Curated annotation (Swiss-Prot):
The chain crosses the membrane at residues 363-383, 385-405. Residues 1-29 form the signal peptide. Its EC number is 5.3.4.1. FU repeats lie at residues 208-255, 268-315. InterPro entries: DUF3456, ECM_structural_protein, EGF-like_Ca-bd_dom, EGF-like_dom, EGF-type_Asp/Asn_hydroxyl_site, EGF_Ca-bd_CS, Furin_repeat, Growth_fac_rcpt_cys_sf. It catalyses: Catalyzes the rearrangement of -S-S- bonds in proteins. Its main location: membrane. It comes from Mus musculus (Mouse). The gene is Creld1. A motif (CXXC) lies at residues 46-49, 278-281. GO terms for cellular component: glutamatergic synapse; membrane; synapse. This is Protein disulfide isomerase Creld1.
């Protein structure tokens, strides 16, 4: 059993501090573990190769800027001609191509380092675009702009304007992807060259297409007005060149459960739960029930709760009935409590005496003070020679002492003995 803290503010604080410091070091000094990082998707190899080439080109600019720029022009030109295509410059550039934590870049650089050296010393003149030569032609990780897939096929809409300029060709520039066009809002078709559902052609020429939104519920239209509708969206019907809402609740389209009712909404419908009082319903509330649930009864046009407590439904001794919505429950009557399935009378705790909350030490101090006062009073009365008042006082003290000892006899006697 854990030790109880001492009484008093200062002793309690010292006790808590000693308990805290008694804990083993790893328990209260060890920091909480860091959260597990979420898994990171690996980039496409083409994207890694493009980043490598971009950093390579930045390195070329950096090495020229750091080594030359300002001074003797003739001397710089002579030195630059030697440094420009030197192995020293290549090493300096390659050292800064990949960041320390970019493992994909380091792996790709290790695989392609000989190709980069070959391009640096022998192929720069015939293939000045390192990205095209390395990533597309040599490693075959990428495709030219506007193409996709293992064979670098043209994206829908052509390589000049993939997806008509109104969408994104999936896998463009890589050896992967499907080439499917993900069109912008309002555009559709295989190459995003048409207006999508709910839009109409506001402007079109050989290189330009503007799609604007139709009136709310229109699926196809010739203009922005309500009367321009040609076809309506699902949940609407064309009536006199206008789209009107279909009330699905009056058709077989609505499929609600047995204890639900249908509510029509714009272009659709909702199924909502019947009231608790209903066993099937035609709408909200206890007045729209088809039948009443158990615990309810028909009163006029509504299903209302039955008060089961009007009849004797709680046979147990000292039980009483409490009505609930659609039912009832049996609980113990006031002054009783549940115990092992039956209601038993609650025991009222006896009121504590005057000395009930006092500790042993406090009793000893009080006892010593009490008897000290008695001895002092007796000595004073005896010194005055007043035998009558002395006798009365001794009798009163004896009566009080007898009552006190009857309440706390064991503890007082023990304290008295210890006090002596």
């Amino acid at each position: 059993m854990a030790p109880l803290p001492p009484r008093g503010l200062v002793p309690s604080l010292l006790w808590c501090l000693s308990l805290f410091l008694s804990l083993p070091g790893p328990v209260w000094l060890q920091p909480s573990p860091p959260p597990h990082p979420s898994p990171r998707a690996e980039p496409h190899p083409c994207h890694t190769c493009r980043a490598l080439v971009d950093n390579f080109n930045k390195g070329l600019e950096r090495t020229i800027r750091d080594n030359f720029g300002g001074g003797n022009t003739a001397w710089e030109e002579e030195k630059l001609s030697k440094y420009k295509d030197s192995e020293t410059r290549l090493v300096e550039v390659l050292e800064g191509v990949c960041s320390r934590s970019d493992f994909e870049c380091h792996r790709l650089l290790e695989l392609s380092e000989e190709l980069v050296e070959n391009w640096w010393f022998h192929r720069q003149q015939e293939a000045p675009d390192l990205f095209q030569w390395l990533c597309s032609d040599s490693l075959k990780l990428c495709c030219p702009s506007g193409t996709f897939g293992p064979s670098c096929l043209p994206c829908p809409g052509g390589t000049e304007r993939p997806c008509g300029g109104y969408g994104q060709c999936e896998g463009e520039g890589t050896r992967g992807g499907s080439g499917h066009c993900d069109c912008q809002a309002g555009y559709g078709g295989e190459a995003c060259g048409q207006c999508g559902l709910g839009y109409f052609e506001a402007e079109r020429n050989s290189s330009h297409l503007v799609c604007s939104a139709c009136f709310g519920p229109c699926a196809r239209c010739t203009g922005p007005e309500e009367s321009h509708c040609l076809q309506c969206k699902k949940g609407w019907a064309l009536h006199h060149l206008k789209c009107v809402d279909i009330d699905e609740c009056g058709t077989e389209q609505a499929t609600c459960g047995a204890d639900q009712f249908c509510v029509n909404t714009e272009g659709s419908y909702e199924c909502r739960d019947c009231a608790k009082a209903c066993l099937g319903c035609m709408g909200a509330g206890p007045g729209r029930c088809k039948k009443c649930s158990r615990g309810y009864q028909q009163v006029g046009s509504k299903c209302l709760d039955v008060d089961e407590c009007e009849t004797v439904v709680c046979p147990g001794e000292n039980e009483k009935c409490e009505n609930t919505e659609g039912g009832y429950r049996c609980v113990c009557a006031e002054g009783y409590r549940q115990e092992d399935g039956i209601c038993v009378k609650e025991q009222v705790p006896e009121s504590a005496g005057f000395f009930a909350e006092m500790t042993e030490d406090e009793m000893v101090v009080l006892q010593q003070m009490f008897f000290g006062v008695i001895i002092c009073a007796l000595a004073t009365l005896a010194a005055k020679g007043d035998l009558v008042f002395t006798a009365i006082f001794i009798g009163a003290v004896a009566a009080m002492t007898g009552y006190w000892l009857s309440e706390r006899s064991d503890r007082v006697l023990e304290g008295f003995i210890k006090g002596r």
